[in-house]
A protein has these predicted regions:
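Helix-loop-helix
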Residues: 50-95, 230-250
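Short hydrophobic beta-strand that contains or immediately precedes a catalytic carboxylate
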Residues: 32-36, 145-147, 211-213
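Short beta-strand-to-coil "C-cap" segments at the C-terminal boundary of structured domains/repeats
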Residues: 22, 133-134, 155-157, 264-271
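Glycine- and acidic-residue-rich phosphate-binding/metal-coordinating active-site segment common to enzymes
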Residues: 156-194
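Catalytic core of PPM/PP2C metal-dependent serine/threonine phosphatase domains
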Residues: 80-157, 184-206
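C-terminal catalytic subdomain
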Residues: 190-342
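N-terminal entry segment of metal-dependent catalytic domains or homologous docking segments
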Residues: 1-71, 150
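Short glycine- and acidic-rich boundary segments immediately preceding or forming the N-terminal edge
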Residues: 1-26, 98-119, 137-138, 165-181, ...
Length: 342
């Protein structure tokens, strides 16, 4: 079972690309991903389409990154690389970053950048968050691949939502990010160095849900746990997969201040009813916590409630979180998992 959600804040101007969901049945390999074109850094007009609509650098960048990720995965399948983190050679892991760098380098400006635009401006800036996986009879092996502050997660009936990526940002703490907007320290672009971080995950028991989301979903809620509450609240009220997608779409549109996209695949559940029933107890626990939220107009009470809610939620949420990047790795534009620069 799989679904994608895509909404745009301004009709016709959405800078998130469509979510990516691909599964190759013969090898049981798949990839899902989201791509958030960064409208602030990439607000310059890149081109006009056949209807005369202006498209920004951010709009073009997210679509390019999606295309690059799709073609990278298709190339892996065409080469019959049945991927498994326990057996595959480490150099395979560099392919997505190299693929993105090759594509974006093809549109890198050749002239000197004007001093007027400032250091914040980027040519074709976008985030990438993807999960590459191989499903097996009783577990799934996956790796997270990302640049920027879009996120990848795993959701299980027992442990709930757990982050598989750590934002490339000045302040990676997910609670503080809800009240401030830290600067990103890494993003895909055509005119600056970037890296795609890789984090392999061994056997994750089935059943589970793998998902990727842009910050339009998780960046406009009261606490980090509210995103999981949105996921499970809509799930438990849905009759089937299409209904769940529709409820997610309408719910995120009601609270977000940004474009929002999500890609999700449920593995090991025989039916939608089994998925919904499996998450019912977890949702009941989350709902009890959410129902205790004070009036948001009471700033002090709200601050204390948020801190307490995060204290309860944090251990499970961060149980699989990768360690922070070393400062020298960040400054050099590479990690121990994926080397190279643009």
């Amino acid at each position: 079972m799989a679904l994608g959600v895509w909404t745009e804040r301004r009709p016709g101007q959405g800078e998130d690309a469509d979510p990516l969901l691909l599964h190759h049945r013969p090898t049981r390999c798949g990839v899902l991903g989201v791509f958030d074109g960064l409208g602030g850094a990439g607000s310059s007009i890149a081109w006009h389409d056949a209807d005369g609509n202006a498209r920004t650098d951010a709009w073009v960048a997210s679509r390019m990154a999606r295309l690059a990720t799709e073609s990278w995965f298709a190339g892996e399948i065409d080469d019959r690389r049945a991927w498994d983190s326990e057996t595959q050679a480490p150099d395979i892991y560099t392919d997505l970053g190299a693929h993105l760098r090759q594509l974006f380098a093809g549109v890198r400006p050749t002239g000197r950048r004007s001093k007027v635009v400032g250091t914040m401006r980027r040519r074709l800036p976008t985030t990438v968050a993807a999960l590459r996986y191989t499903a097996r009879d009783s577990d799934v092996v996956c790796e997270a691949l990302w640049a920027g502050d879009s996120r990848a997660y795993v959701l299980t009936p027992d442990a709930g939502l757990q982050a598989l990526t750590r934002d490339h940002a000045d302040d990676p703490d997910v609670l503080s990010q809800l009240v401030q907007d830290p600067q990103m320290t890494n993003m895909v672009s055509a005119d600056r160095e970037f890296f795609v971080q890789r984090q392999p995950y061994g056997r994750i028991p089935l059943p589970c849900v793998l998902l990727c989301a842009t910050d339009g979903f998780f960046g406009y809620v009261q606490t980090p746990g509210d995103f999981e509450h949105v996921l499970l609240n809509t799930l438990c009220r849905s009759t089937d997969l299409d209904d769940w997608a529709a409820r997610l779409t309408s719910t995120v549109a009601s609270y977000t201040g940004d474009d929002a996209s999500l890609a999700l695949v449920a593995l090991g559940f025989r039916t939608f009813d089994e998925l919904r029933a499996g998450c019912a107890e977890r949702f009941a626990w989350l709902d009890r916590d959410a129902s205790a939220m004070p009036d948001p107009r009471g700033a002090e009470a709200m601050r204390h409630w948020r801190a307490r809610a995060w204290e309860r939620y944090r251990p499970g949420y961060e149980a699989r979180l990768p360690p922070p990047l070393a400062s020298d790795a960040r400054s050099q534009g590479r990690t121990r998992d994926e080397g190279g620069t643009a």
